[in-house]
Design a protein with these regions (language model features):
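N-terminal capping/small domains of soluble enzymes
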Residues: 1-110, 114-123, 136, 304-308, ...
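A short, mixed-charge helix-start or loop-turn motif at secondary-structure junctions
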Residues: 20, 122-126, 191-195, 299-303
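Electropositive, surface-exposed helix/loop patches at the edges of structured domains
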Residues: 78-95, 213-226, 231, 290-308
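Glycine-rich phosphate/ribose-binding loops and adjacent secondary-structure elements
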Residues: 125-294
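Active-site or pore-adjacent capping/gating segments
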Residues: 259-265, 272-333, 337
Length: 366
């Protein structure tokens, strides 16, 4: 990832990366586990709102540093330690919206990193303070390249709102990689009305983004990473067949390292839910010690064991996708193409731009 401009592009072993999830939203142990698991699988992990922790940097072979509108935890020295920089413009679960970290997660360490009072709700802005449009973004990217001496790739993360035009603008601004996040992406930092009603489904975003890259003669030169609801090898194979270069996972990685572990069933019951259905990650009461800053709960998560679980999950996802590629007669995942796909509904056919099963008809295609 990042072969167009960066002197040191990310060379990953698998086409699955770990998306940005902040220290603060997650415990330090969880961030360490993500770093360990991703590194053992030969892929990257991403910081999130709130900055870089020593545990995460120390255990991550490839670490992507997110630059967000809030600038919470932003440290130029940490930025130089990163293997790539991701400028976050939008998130699939809340395009056009900011975020919130509830006060019960703002302990002494989080407060110090974010320069905030302890125990007070933290609100994140939705707009960057030092640029307002694509022309400014181009200048910002050049600034970041100078800071890092043009060594590391610059990612631009956009939400699935206007994928064709947003992808085109990111490419013209000088992005090495476009990360496109569909509305199925998870978050614990916005209201339900956003989660349910704002943005486009991940499937509907891929083709317009690929079309934009092709129209600019930049497909494969500027890489496309798809996120938002990716769960298994089938999702990976479909995204790559539609033209993506890689995918990114967030909520699935949390489950892999031990969230919703049946071991804590009784405690999930006390919270009014059950293992396998718990998603109140914003409240800071996660019995598994992942989405919490409660010292008693955090101690329950062993980063070494949790990292191994994530590694196993990533390897199995990759093997599943490879198996599907072989079934299509391909010797590489990256040889998958739209011709290997068909859709089971008219809606899916129209969104993905592939024929309806049993026909040659692509709805909406002239």
């Amino acid at each position: 990832l990042g072969t167009k401009y960066a002197k040191k592009p990310l060379e990953l072993d698998i086409p699955i990366t770990i998306a940005g999830m902040s220290f603060g939203a997650l415990s330090g142990q969880a961030k360490e586990a993500l770093g360990r698991g991703a590194s053992a699988a030969g892929t990257s992990t991403t910081t999130g709102d709130g900055g870089m922790t020593p545990e995460e940097r120390g255990q991550s072979k490839y670490l992507v540093y997110q630059l967000l509108p809030s600038r919470y935890g932003m440290n130029p020295d940490d930025l130089r330690k990163a293997d790539a920089i991701e400028v976050v413009i939008g998130q699939g679960a809340k395009p056009g919206g900011g975020g919130m970290l509830l006060g019960q997660k703002i302990n002494d360490r989080v407060a110090k990193m974010r320069t905030l009072p302890k125990g007070v709700d933290q609100r994140s802005a939705c707009r960057h303070p030092d640029w307002t449009g694509p022309d400014d973004l181009k200048i910002k990217i050049l600034e970041l390249r100078e800071i890092t001496k043009w060594k590391v790739p610059i990612f631009i993360k956009i939400a699935g709102a206007r994928p064709y035009y947003d992808t085109a603008l990111a490419v013209k601004a000088g992005a090495d990689v476009v990360v496109l996040d569909g509305m199925q992406g998870g978050t614990a930092a916005t209201q339900e009305v956003f989660i349910e009603n704002v943005g486009q489904p991940t499937l509907a975003c891929i083709k317009p983004a690929v079309d934009a890259l092709q129209d600019l003669n930049s497909h494969r030169e500027v890489q496309l990473v798809i996120s938002g609801g990716i769960r298994n090898g089938g999702d990976v194979a479909k995204a790559l067949a539609l033209g993506a270069d890689a995918v990114s996972i967030g909520s699935a990685a949390m489950i892999a390292i031990g969230d919703n572990n049946p071991k804590w069933e009784k405690e999930y019951n006390k919270l009014g839910t059950t293992a396998g259905a718990y998603d109140d990650w914003h409240e800071g009461n996660d019995p598994a010690g992942i989405s919490t800053q409660n010292p008693k709960l955090m101690k329950r998560l062993d980063p070494v064991k949790a990292g191994k679980r994530l590694t196993n999950y990533l390897k199995v996802m990759t093997l599943e996708a490879q198996t599907l590629a072989r079934a299509c007669g391909k010797n590489s995942l990256h040889n998958l193409e739209p011709e290997d796909l068909c859709a089971l509904t008219v809606e899916a056919a129209a969104m993905a731009g592939v024929p309806l099963a049993g026909t040659n008809w692509i709805p909406g295609k002239k």
